[in-house]
Amino acid sequence: MAVSWIVFDLWLLTVFLGQIGGHSLFSCEPITLRMCQDLPYNTTFMPNLLNHYDQQTAALAMEPFHPMVNLDCSRDFRPFLCALYAPICMEYGRVTLPCRRLCQRAYSECSKLMEMFGVPWPEDMECSRFPDCDEPYPRLVDLNLVGDPTEGAPVAVQRDYGFWCPRELKIDPDLGYSFLHVRDCSPPCPNMYFRREELSFARYFIGLISIICLSATLFTFLTFLIDVTRFRYPERPIIFYAVCYMMVSLIFFIGFLLEDRVACNASSPAQYKASTVTQGSHNKACTMLFMVLYFFTMAGSVWWVILTITWFLAAVPKWGSEAIEKKALLFHASAWGIPGTLTIILLAMNKIEGDNISGVCFVGLYDVDALRYFVLAPLCLYVVVGVSLLLAGIISLNRVRIEIPLEKENQDKLVKFMIRIGVFSILYLVPLLVVIGCYFYEQAYRGIWETTWIQERCREYHIPCPYQVTQMSRPDLILFLMKYLMALIVGIPSIFWVGSKKTCFEWASFFHGRRKKEIVNESRQVLQEPDFAQSLLRDPNTPIIRKSRGTSTQGTSTHASSTQLAMVDDQRSKAGSVHSKVSSYHGSLHRSRDGRYTPCSYRGMEERLPHGSMSRLTDHSRHSSSHRLNEQSRHSSIRDLSNNPMTHITHGTSMNRVIEEDGTSA
């Protein structure tokens, strides 16, 4: 018997101390419950053994048992109830419970009467919970340890009870919810800080920004699909970066359409249940929104880090495009593997929370620890690594600009490329740093916001008000709007990188049902124009001006740079223009009706005339054209080819290629 009492007292002490662990004071107070007057003791403590934080709440819970007490169904029933609702107050840390035999007698003698009044026997009052003994309550040894109430103690003793979950916010224990470190509790919906009209404005604001970001990132991705070979390393990560934020903006847009149907649990007035925030993975729709949003948010940041890595490899060790592309598998494994691992960990820890402002589900909205370790820590790490590599690459490019003598045109291209990298990085880093700043501010002041909310709603929810509140504050809506704005706008800079004349030409070709044509196809198209003969009659010393079809910001490093190709084309233009145009005419000659070739159909290069203008030339013009072609084109071609030295085409690094092409694409 003694051993069982010791074991049970230890268990009860653990439970009781856990209940009042957040209370800064423990004191005895006079019993004010009408049902518990005229007992051998007159002091009690709160919260009691049934988790009633004050005597008023305990009195409300005892009301269903008044008929049984008034009808005196058992002389043990009233002492048994008071032992639970107003237990005897002894020195701190000593708690005693009624004996099991006392409970069994009260139950057997009053259970039928309780059934008549429709009052069920509470689960907290099951007799198997109490120690196996047969002694009255309170025991004589307990009466000797009764504490005296504090002199002049008021009826309602002010103590720090901590947060007590209201009945309206309680959740089924199987779901594993938690709010303000209280289990089986969830925050209220709509948001606990803002009014409905403020939430409505915020939701439409987030929806508008998500549409803008979705349009920009989708345009970037579709531009990539039109010409996949245009964007290669070191710039290929920009495309995956855009895809990630395209998915992020899509999830926010879906949240705007869903409102709070996924982020919040439905209310149940019949069970006194208010609408609460969704937590955990039991809600499949909320889980899917969380997985996509968190995964692509982290993946977008990792792809930005990989972009800085590829720029660093191209600028400092001068890696070529093919060398960087060989590491593509490692890049993809890191960019998708790290966010995937973090997402799986959060799913296993059941850290999903509904966002009743944006309508999506994320992590760290109410759990500060999850925010600190799964949002702030990764983002800060990505920023530090990315900025370090970015600065190293820019410093290397600037050293090249200063130390290596370059032509003025190449100097301007290099400066322009450095400015472009800097602007793109600033457009990404500034919004991301603002988001990180909002998260830090939120975690620093969240405790004050929660205390203010409890202070304002404690009487409405009938829960203890905060004890000795020294500071009260409510969050500003602009803080949350800024956080969502910067979290979405961070994906828009990708459109500035693909914006060029080349992009406009590709989209124009796409909408006209044409694909990009090669230079050979363009030359053949020129040969088929009806006024081509007139172009042959011009002065051969006049340089050929070709229309630009736009240039790409990408290409392979095995090709010559655009500047070198332009030099070769200019050197060959005088001799090669007549040669290519006249030689292409040879295949279009026709025989005359008597089976002979026309006089201008000799095999020699100098004696060929274009077919496209034959029908419009008179005999005089034909002979004059042939004479001028024979004399001028032959001499000019030989002179130009003999004077121009052989030009060698060299292979450049991927950074040189990007710099040169960048100068012509903007």
UniProtKB/Swiss-Prot annotation:
Disulphide bridges, residue numbers: C28-C89, C36-C82, C73-C110, C99-C133, C103-C127
Keywords of the record: Cell membrane, Developmental protein, Disulfide bond, G-protein coupled receptor, Glycoprotein, Membrane, Neurogenesis, Receptor, Signal, Transducer, Transmembrane, Transmembrane helix, Ubl conjugation, Wnt signaling pathway
A single Gene Ontology CC term: cytoplasm
Molecular functions (GO terms): G protein-coupled receptor activity; PDZ domain binding; Wnt receptor activity; Wnt-protein binding
Positions glycosylated per UniProt: N42, N265, N356
Entry-linked SUPFAM superfamilies: Frizzled cysteine-rich domain
Family: Belongs to the G-protein coupled receptor Fz/Smo family.
Name recorded for this polypeptide: Frizzled-3
Gene: Fzd3
